[in-house]
Regions:
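Charged catalytic carboxylate motif
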Residues: 90, 149, 203
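Juxta-kinase regulatory segment immediately upstream of eukaryotic protein kinase catalytic domains
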Residues: 1-40
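C-lobe/activation-segment region of protein kinase-like
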Residues: 175, 179-222
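AlphaC helix of the protein kinase catalytic domain
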Residues: 133-142
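Conserved alphaE helix
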Residues: 145-153
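Conserved ATP-binding subdomain of kinase catalytic cores across diverse folds
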Residues: 25-132, 155, 159-160
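Conserved catalytic-loop position in the HRD/HxD motif
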Residues: 161, 166, 184
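Hydrophobic residue at the +6 position relative to the catalytic HRD Asp in the kinase catalytic loop
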Residues: 167-174
Length: 222
């Protein structure tokens, strides 16, 4: 995929010039879209992802927000160690590499890192997967073929070197055509060798237990 970078005094924005023809930092600001009625759904999660109607097409905006006790001190600031090492730029890189390897992930449209003193704030805008619902919502109506295809998809990701930091039933999507996708690659890594799936699958199955999903776990393990 194409990639260009906008550089400001304390701001860097990665963007796809094939989809985003005019770069504006406001596109990464939830308030900008709320004021203009561009928010079509609130998708929840700690980052409170927003589904948007943008000039680049339907998209999902997610700001990087902290959780736990540290959020009481700083809910959206991280120590700055370089633009390329920001959460948004690392996620952009992971998505780009996975797309190059033909894997089903949302296409990144924009990613920003804004430095403020020793800290930074960041956000990412990705293409919306139309008509998709999460595995958490769809698990009860899946057939054996669906579980087979999900298992095959996960094995493709593992073989491609993907290390997902939060593999759970909410981060796996099924679209209207029956295609599976993975989302939310914050803190993900893409290795130059196959990844060990054990811990990722353990995390996924813990989310199954929490949500009361039984499913065909045996079909998700190689």
């Amino acid at each position: 995929m194409s990639e260009q970078q906008f550089r400001g005094p304390s701001l860097r924005i990665l963007y796809d010039p094939q989809r985003v023809t005019a770069v504006s930092p406001e596109w990464l600001d939830p308030g900008f879209w709320r004021l203009r009625g561009g928010v079509t759904a609130e998708l929840g999660g700690r980052g409170q992802a927003l589904q948007l109607d943008t000039p680049a097409g339907p998209a999902v905006l997610r700001r990087y927000l902290r959780g736990g006790m540290v959020a009481r001190v700083s809910h959206d600031r991280y120590f700055f160690t370089g633009y390329s090492r920001s959460r948004a730029f690392i996620e952009w890189s992971a998505l780009s590499r996975l797309l190059e390897r033909g894997l089903p992930v949302p296409r990144p449209l924009m990613a920003s890192c804004e430095r403020r003193g020793p800290y930074y704030r960041a956000g990412i805008l990705t293409e919306l997967i139309p008509g998709a619902r999460s595995l958490a919502d769809a698990a009860g109506v899946l057939g054996e073929d669906d579980w087979h295809r999900l298992g095959a998809m996960l094995q493709r990701f593992f073989a491609a070197g993907m290390v997902h930091a939060d593999l759970n039933a909410h981060n796996i999507l099924l679209d209207a055509a029956g295609r599976w996708y993975l989302i939310d690659f914050d803190r993900a890594r893409v290795l130059d060798r196959p990844a060990r799936p054990d811990r990722m699958l353990q995390r996924l199955f813990r989310s199954f237990d929490k949500l009361g999903i039984e499913g065909r776990r045996d079909l998700l393990v190689a």
